[in-house]
Regions:
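Ligand-binding pocket segment of bilobal, Venus flytrap-like solute-binding proteins
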Residues: 74-78, 162-187, 209-210
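Periplasmic-binding protein-like
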Residues: 101-111, 187-213, 217, 221, ...
Length: 344
């Protein structure tokens, strides 16, 4: 059984109050504020304020981090909107997205060798993390040039292995995210043929927490929101302190400060809690999640028992997409709103 077992309505299983929590993260520009906050003492400051202990743990493989969350080994994890839906939510784990951090605005891309346009991808073998946002981006790109997923062959490749795979002269198409995207785009003959700035606000980067754990321990949500907004305010400062914070994040991500700043330029950060609350309350989120769930269902990611894209309910502020009796992914603005109101 899952260590943070959750089932049923509204977060399900009754949870005892706890003080120790583990949050997983993987390397991505929009998630580097988390490990930096731990190093800089910001995690301890907010955790102490709310009487909890929060340990941030790096997982080298992104999909593995989401699987660990799904298996109850982590109380929360950094992940995308699509992966929150297709891994924990589709697996029956009631999951709450409590921080809307950013959207990918060029941080995810399709790279081709020796091609002038995306249409030349037809018939090629494409290396990517299958059934992830990379697969979604590929589908959106293909449809923009009148092609379908059946026009290409895909090979499942871990984000940790993707640069090496594309370095092979026989590999001519890849879909990945930064920092790997910047690496593969530098290879001889390579060029980005389609990227996420062409589908703004569709690939969302989140912090999600087990709903039952959050319900029993609301101070965890408050501490996480406090940590996040203090850290990203520092990160955005155009002074020596901001530059030092970004340089430290770059080092943790295995990037140079220049490369990290370039990655941030293709990340649309919701830079204040007010911005994030506006985004989570916008009708755009509903239309994005409709596209994402329709794609996910079409790829069989809701499991064999799912009869339609409505099988898994998605809770949005003020409304539910799909089955209101089976809500498994919740976009919960509570803690962002507390931050926006200065009430943390």
């Amino acid at each position: 059984m899952m260590a943070t077992g959750s089932c049923g309505d509204g977060g399900g299983a009754q949870q005892a109050k706890r003080t120790d929590f583990t949050i997983g993260w993987s390397i991505y520009a929009g998630w580097m504020p988390w490990p930096y906050a731990q190093q800089a003492g910001i995690v301890k400051k907010w955790a102490d304020k709310y009487g909890v202990r929060i340990n941030l743990v790096q997982v080298n493989d992104y999909v593995e981090s989401v699987n660990q969350f799904n298996a109850g080994k982590l109380d929360g994890v950094t992940l995308t909107n699509m992966d929150a839906l297709t891994i924990p939510a589709a697996g029956g784990k009631d999951t709450s997205a409590i921080i809307l951090g950013d959207y990918s605005n060029g941080n995810d891309g399709v790279v081709l060798k020796n091609a002038k346009s995306l249409s030349e991808i037809k018939g090629r073998t494409v290396y990517l993390v299958e059934l992830s946002v990379s697969h979604y981006l590929l589908a959106r790109g293909l449809s923009s040039v009148g092609l379908k997923l059946s026009d290409v062959k895909t090979v499942n490749t871990s984000d940790a292995d993707i640069v090496g795979a594309f370095a092979n002269p026989a590999a001519t198409a890849v879909v990945t995210w930064n920092p790997q995207l910047g690496e593969v785009a530098k290879l001889p003959g390579a060029a980005v043929a389609f990227d996420s700035h062409q589908i703004p606000a569709e690939i969302l980067d989140l912090l999600a927490v087990d709903t039952a754990t959050l319900k029993a321990n609301p101070n965890l949500g408050k501490a996480l929101a406090g940590i996040w907004y203090e850290t990203i305010a520092l990160m955005q400062r155009q002074d020596a302190g901001g530059a030092a914070a970004r340089a430290a994040m770059a080092k943790m991500a295995g990037s140079t400060p220049q490369s990290f700043d370039a990655q941030l330029s293709t990340t649309h950060l919701y830079g204040t809690p007010k911005d994030a609350v506006a985004a989570i309350r916008s009708p755009t989120l509903g239309s994005t999640m409709t596209k994402v769930r329709d794609f996910s269902f079409s790829k069989g990611l809701f499991g064999q028992g799912a009869r339609s894209a409505d099988a898994i309910g998605i809770g949005l502020p003020g409304k539910t997409l799909g089955d209101a009796k089976n809500v498994k992914l919740r976009f919960d603005s509570t803690y962002m709103e507390l931050a926006a109101a200065g009430k943390l």
